A protein has these predicted regions:
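Cofactor-binding beta-sheet edge motifs in enzyme active sites
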Residues: 1-203
């Protein structure tokens, strides 16, 4: 700017921008579960490794009697910055993806198994049921298409989403995302909607 005598605007690409900041904390998570012959989920075991220990992100709301959730520290020489709901966005994906595997092992519909294990949590159920209803859960889907459901609690808010996908020549395309949220009293409903919409776009 000094050489040319005029202001210069510099815009980094996404790839360049990510190289000029510290990283999100890396984390790995291992799961095991015990499922009885009648489909009852007996135990849930989760051991995860990361530099810091999140307080509530790995905790599941499901009524599984035997739960073991354990953290081990993973020292790193890299500086990290836990911004933007890091723990919840990571552990929410881990736990809900594994829960679907548990549902398959139990021979249960993933939505119905969630309902069964949330019978004493009416607030969770209301959000889950609303997302499933608006998405038309249970309606037939065509070959090559898929539908998944998830539920996560973060900072006092409950969010459930149903995603419809299409697989074409081995590539996954997202057709629709249905999102339901209970954030308590919303001072700015438009702000809540914008947060959900932008979060979905960011995730994609």
């Amino acid at each position: 700017a000094r050489e040319v005598g005029t202001p210069v605007k510099l815009i980094w690409s996404r790839a360049e921008d990510m190289q000029h900041d510290i990283y999100r904390p890396g984390v790995s998570s291992k799961f095991r579960a015990a499922v009885a012959a009648d489909g009852q989920v007996l135990a849930w075991d989760n051991v995860y490794h990361e530099k810091h220990e999140p307080a509530e992100a790995p905790v599941i709301p499901y009524a599984i009697t035997a739960q073991h959730i354990h953290h081990t520290d993973s020292p790193t020489h890299l500086p990290f910055g836990p911004w933007r709901s890091v723990d919840h966005s990571q552990h929410g994906f881990f736990t809900e993806a594994f829960f679907d595997e548990v549902a398959e092992a139990a021979g249960e519909d993933p939505y119905q198994l969630r309902r069964k294990l949330l019978k004493d949590k009416p607030r969770h159920l209301k959000v889950l049921d609303l997302a499933a209803e608006k998405a038309g859960w249970g309606e037939p889907i065509a070959q090559g298409k898929g539908r998944g459901i998830s539920l996560q609690e973060s900072f006092g808010s409950l969010v459930a989403q149903v995603v419809d996908i299409t697989v074409t020549e081995g590539k996954i395309g997202v057709d629709r995302v249905v999102c339901a949220i209970d954030a308590g009293f919303a001072v700015s409903p438009d702000g809540v909607a914008a947060q959900m919409e932008s979060g979905i776009i960011y995730g994609l």
